[in-house]
Amino acid sequence: TSRYNKVWEFPYEVRGRRVTMVFTSVTGHLSNFEFADDRHRRWNGVDPRELLVNAAVAKRVPEDKRQVADNVKREARGCDSVILWLDCDREGENIAFEVLAACREANRGIAAFRARFSALSR
């Protein structure tokens, strides 16, 4: 478990159904895009044109986010659905899809719902 992303469980009602709500958080993105080949990661050791034309890119969970991603996967295994409560902007949407991918890696059949909210300000 990530010490920064606690897990809470409590009884709740969703769409008229009593459920056990499992609530946790993430700290930013769960994954990064990196060059797949180690030799492409050294900026001064490769021709930039090769990076644009020939370099494969892979999406990976960085070491500092592994505990957070593992926490999401562990909790998703026992859930029927996930409600994604992330910011309703581009980054929030991107992070929501990363969280959903982690959930579905652990539980292919998990249903997904998206909470939509906005802030009122003066």
Residues covered by each model-derived region:
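Intrinsically disordered, low-complexity regulatory segments
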Residues: 1-122
